[in-house]
Amino acid sequence: MDKIRIVGGNELKGTIPISGAKNAALPLMIASLLTEEKLILENVPRLADVALLQRILGNHGVDITTNGKRNGDDPYAGQTLEIDARVIVDTTAPYDLVSRMRASFWVLGPLLARIGVAKVSLPGGCAIGTRPVDFHLDALRALGAEIEIDAGYVVAKAPQGLKGARIVFPKVSVGATHTALMAATLARGDSIIENAAREPEVVDLADCLIKMGARITGAGSSTIHVEGVARLKAARHAVLPDRIETGTYAMATAMTGGDVMLAGARPDLLESALDALRQAGAEIDATNEGIRVRRNGAGILPVDVTTAPYPGFPTDLQAQFMALMTKAKGNCRITETIFENRFMHVQELARLGARIHLDGDTAVVEGVERLTGAPVMATDLRASVSLVIAGLAAEGETMVQRVYHLDRGFEKLEEKLSRCGAQIERISG
């Protein structure tokens, strides 16, 4: 099993290209199931989750051609996928594939909307809380689907097709919003999705669906209107830049006292996180090239944050920000409101010398002057990269185990950091 070895103490200086967003690419790939015509996606990141979803779609009969690099010989350019879902040979998504990635559950809505039947295993993915699929199923039931749970599978039928409906989510859910949005595009009549997720990835999905012929208004607000259409057509769409990757490298730069240009990043996608970084003492400037992040030798200031649905502070940056706060000049409180059990990185950060106390859904971080390298173990995607950030600022060697989590969400992480001066390498074995 691969490990990542880090020798801390180096400032990050240089340019890090930001990849396409995984959390946008996955639902966009799944949206291909809604049409018999080709969907071409550009700027798709090269990640384990993307490769797994290609396998899952292939299981349904979808043909995917990878057209390599978009921009000449740039090794960091996103790949282009040409997706042809003209023929669906199987409407079952099996346990052995779906259990490995939660987002693969989203095939349920498009298959049901287009084919009228789907059988999808209950999902897997990161071990963060329970994250039930009830909101997805309730949305599809509202659209007229008949749904049963049988031996660990969701069996859904809509023999007469889906019908437009009013869908009200009791709590904001990005995944359920994706499901409702995709299914409603082919439903007969109008649908209104209330308390919808406002995340940029939802907007990106809506933008792509509109290019495919969907009639959608209100994406990015809490109320989305969808006028169903009979069919969707071919389209070409570029995946938006990854705001979580952007925030991660911005926090790593602030942690090491560096100066990094995050090329291709969009500041409008993560304003709350950038505001927190400014309060912590980082200098952040938007340019035509991307976002420049710097921190001088004044030290890191403590900042309280509470995770919240977009446009609030992203839960997917909570672990990384906690790593930054371990070296703050004072104490801060980090409150997690989105997922339970998302403090699994606390014990591992403590192995590096961090002082963190848990009080329910809040972590109280007492900043320390120095962290010391040690062997640590990743527990999930975002926790694993928080350990890398801490390792960059720790004295001595940090060895991060279970780095397969990183490969699910960060493209060429060691390469991007090492080109900016980090002493980091992957050790196979």
Swiss-Prot record:
Listed GO CC annotations: cytoplasm
Residues binding UDP-N-acetyl-alpha-D-glucosamine: 102, 171-174, 316, 338
EC class of the enzyme, as a word: transferase
Keywords: Cell cycle, Cell division, Cell shape, Cell wall biogenesis/degradation, Cytoplasm, Peptidoglycan synthesis, Pyruvate, Transferase
EC number of this enzyme: 2.5.1.7
Cross-referenced HAMAP family: MurA (MF_00111)
Pathway noted in the entry: Cell wall biogenesis; peptidoglycan biosynthesis
Binding residue positions for phosphoenolpyruvate: 22-23
Known catalytic reactions: phosphoenolpyruvate + UDP-N-acetyl-alpha-D-glucosamine = UDP-N-acetyl-3-O-(1-carboxyvinyl)-alpha-D-glucosamine + phosphate
UniProt xrefs under NCBIfam families: murA (TIGR01072), PRK09369.1 (NF006873)
Record's protein name: UDP-N-acetylglucosamine 1-carboxyvinyltransferase
InterPro entries in alphabetical order: Enolpyruvate_Tfrase_dom, Enolpyruvate_Tfrase_sf, MurA_subfamily, RNA3'P_cycl/enolpyr_Trfase_a/b, UDP_GlcNAc_COvinyl_MurA
GO molecular function, one term: UDP-N-acetylglucosamine 1-carboxyvinyltransferase activity
CDD domains per UniProt: UdpNAET (cd01555)
Single GO BP term: cell division
Main location: cytoplasm
Location of the active site: 126 (proton donor)
Function of the protein: Cell wall formation. Adds enolpyruvyl to UDP-N-acetylglucosamine.
Protein family membership: Belongs to the EPSP synthase family. MurA subfamily.
Modified residues (2-(S-cysteinyl)pyruvic acid O-phosphothioketal): 126
Localization per Swiss-Prot or TrEMBL: Cytoplasm
